[in-house]
């Protein structure tokens, strides 16, 4: 089995081409933002299934392909682990799985090559690398859930997508004024706010496995994305101390004809209960509505009842589901 933590350009392009094919067929992307960002990094393992029928864990040298069945997977933290040494432009990619450093797994198989055991081969390879893997099914697709359940995995987490229309047909509710003195909203400035933003984010999402683990490097990676627009990132400052923030994501910066996403909204635990989050939400929703954006969506854990009630009061309704499953522990 071939392994690497760094995809060469041709394979990276092949993964993105397969992603477009699968997304169009299934109606939902099988990879989330973290997996997409990992295509350009070196913090994940990439399992590929090519037309020769071999599941390819791209972390060891190409020359080890013939001994895949007996070879131990390379240590992803081993600095001597080689990068993908070839640029196989003539390969046909049938399937792909991303294994992130936190154990998150997500993947896809070409619709034209399903029900041939490819998904099972990729799943076995991923679980061999990370027996504790959390495997995502984006869109909670019935066939994918059945496949993983039959393989012995059980649901452990559910993420909901909520959406609401913007415009006169569904007026925005009025938000009570915040109860903190000296509070003001301002546009995010990296040199001033980045460190405090990360610190507040860690505290606000202490129990969230992905968001709470965000580092300064992770923030900078997202600030460098084409969709980032500083005008869509607001911070709440109390006497110049950052105590909250809201971040809007538009796939095309400045676009007004497509839905926007509440990428993240949070307040420092020390000011929770002072209506700061509601003030941030009201501000960005009113701005998006003025811009003529047709709708807005956000993501929330299905078991977060207080957040669900809050967003329902804001007019949001469930529009999608993502499910994470894990292998059942054997006694």
UniProtKB/Swiss-Prot annotation:
It is an enzyme of class 2 (transferase). Residues 59-89 are annotated as: Disordered. One of its GO terms (molecular function) is mycothiol synthase activity. PROSITE patterns: GNAT. Residues 59-86 have a biased composition (Low complexity). InterPro entries: Acyl_CoA_acyltransferase, GNAT_dom, MshD_Acetyltransferase, Mycothiol_AcTrfase. Keywords: Acyltransferase, Repeat, Transferase. 1D-myo-inositol 2-(L-cysteinylamino)-2-deoxy-alpha-D-glucopyranoside binds at residues 33, 210, 249, 261, 299. It comes from the Bacteria. Acetyl-CoA 1 binds at residues 115-120. GO terms for biological process: mycothiol biosynthetic process. Belongs to the acetyltransferase family. MshD subfamily. Monomer. Catalyzes the transfer of acetyl from acetyl-CoA to desacetylmycothiol (Cys-GlcN-Ins) to form mycothiol. This is Mycothiol acetyltransferase. It comes from Brachybacterium faecium (strain ATCC 43885 / DSM 4810 / JCM 11609 / LMG 19847 / NBRC 14762 / NCIMB 9860 / 6-10). The lineage of its organism: Bacteria, Bacillati, Actinomycetota, Actinomycetes, Micrococcales.
């Amino acid at each position: 089995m071939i392994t690497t933590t760094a995809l060469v350009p041709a394979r990276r392009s092949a993964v993105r081409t397969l992603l477009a094919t699968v997304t169009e067929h299934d109606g939902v992307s099988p990879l989330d933002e973290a997996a997409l960002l990992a295509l350009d990094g070196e913090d994940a393992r990439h399992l590929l299934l090519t037309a020769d029928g071999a599941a390819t864990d791209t972390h060891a040298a190409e020359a080890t392909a013939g001994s895949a069945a007996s070879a131990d997977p390379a240590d992803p933290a081993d600095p001597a682990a080689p990068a993908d040494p070839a640029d196989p432009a003539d390969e046909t990619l049938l399937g792909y799985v991303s294994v992130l450093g936190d154990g998150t797994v997500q993947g896809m198989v070409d619709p034209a090559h399903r029900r041939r055991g490819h998904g099972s081969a990729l799943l076995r390879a991923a679980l061999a690398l990370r027996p504790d893997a959390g495997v995502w099914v984006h869109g909670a697709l019935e066939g994918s859930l059945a496949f993983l359940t039959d393989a012995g995995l059980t649901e452990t987490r559910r993420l909901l997508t909520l959406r609401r229309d913007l415009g006169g047909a569904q007026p925005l509710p009025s938000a009570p004024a915040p109860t903190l003195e000296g509070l003001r909203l301002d546009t995010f400035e990296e040199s001033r706010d980045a460190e405090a933003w990360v610190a507040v984010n860690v505290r606000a999402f202490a129990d969230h496995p992905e968001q709470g683990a965000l580092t300064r490097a992770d923030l900078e990676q997202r600030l460098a994305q084409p969709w980032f627009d500083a005008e869509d990132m607001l911070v709440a400052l109390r006497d110049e101390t950052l105590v909250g923030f809201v971040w809007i994501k538009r796939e095309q910066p400045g676009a007004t004809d497509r839905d926007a996403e509440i990428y993240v909204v949070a307040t420092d635990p020390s000011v929770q209960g002072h209506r700061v989050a509601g003030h941030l939400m009201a501000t960005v929703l009113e701005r998006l509505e003025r811009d003529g954006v047709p709708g807005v969506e956000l993501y929330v854990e299905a078991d977060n009842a207080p957040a669900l009630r809050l967003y329902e009061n804001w007019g949001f309704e469930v529009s999608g589901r993502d499910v994470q499953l894990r292998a059942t522990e054997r006694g």
